[in-house]
Amino acid sequence: EPTVFTAEDIRPVAQACFTVPYPAVPDNLAAYQVPDEAYTSSYRIRGQQKNAAGVNEQLDYFQYYQVNGTPREGSISFDNAARHYQWKRGDETVGEPSAAAMQTALSLAEQIAPAFELAYGDRTYGMNRTDLETLPSAQTGSRFVFTRSYQGVPSVYTSKDCTSYDNLNDTYVRKIPYEVLYIIVDDLSGVLVEWRSPHTITGVETENVRLLSFAEIMRIAGQLLPLKYASQEKYLEARNQDAYRMTVNRIALSYTRVQSRNDPSQYLFVPVWDFFDANDPLTSLLTISAIDGTVIDRGYGY
């Protein structure tokens, strides 16, 4: 189920990330509450200091609530890298994540969230916002994505979050983002960490659930994939853009979170098969329940 971060979550982030021990990691979040003027239903705490090199190190904690008081997503972030408006995914021209950066990220993740495992890594570059536009900077880095695992199996990571189709003004059915831990190690050894939308596994609904055979999953996918992308395929074919047509190059069995049918405030961690696009390693073209073969829309979260 979705939960809120506590001081016990913030403390290991601070201990792992600050290069100089931070003296004021909160024991009581309420005592450090600072209203966020941009959102009446949220609060924020912040800790910052300069390290030995004079670089500012900053830890932020945000928690958002619906107007009825129900917790929404929260996030803990740390940054001692050069400040950028955002980081964007790189492409094949910027290479693979470095081994040193991966070791740094794995070490931080082990200290911050031991129940998480590495799900994906790529190269990234910083973006700076000017008065007129957002432009890429010369600074690049390695990005690593960690997701919660269960019994040694991580939940797969895709670029589509369950808030993709959300109506931001509809607080009653507001979706909770998938839990994820991002760690970016830039090429100057700066670190950016973001852990968002914490969840807690509260129990097991079904032990030793029987999964459909892979042959049955392939039969279902063979029926559904052509139907789902028929119009897009015809569009690309008509314009001789065969290079962009849908091709599956990876099929993965993992866990994902789906909303409970009986209680929308609760979620289930279920085994699924994902069929990934050859043109984008983070795009799942189809997600199928490994239990009953139903299709799961990652944009809706069920």
Range-by-range predicted roles:
Residues 68-95, 178-183, 187-212, 283-302:
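A short, surface-exposed interaction/processing loop segment used at functional sites
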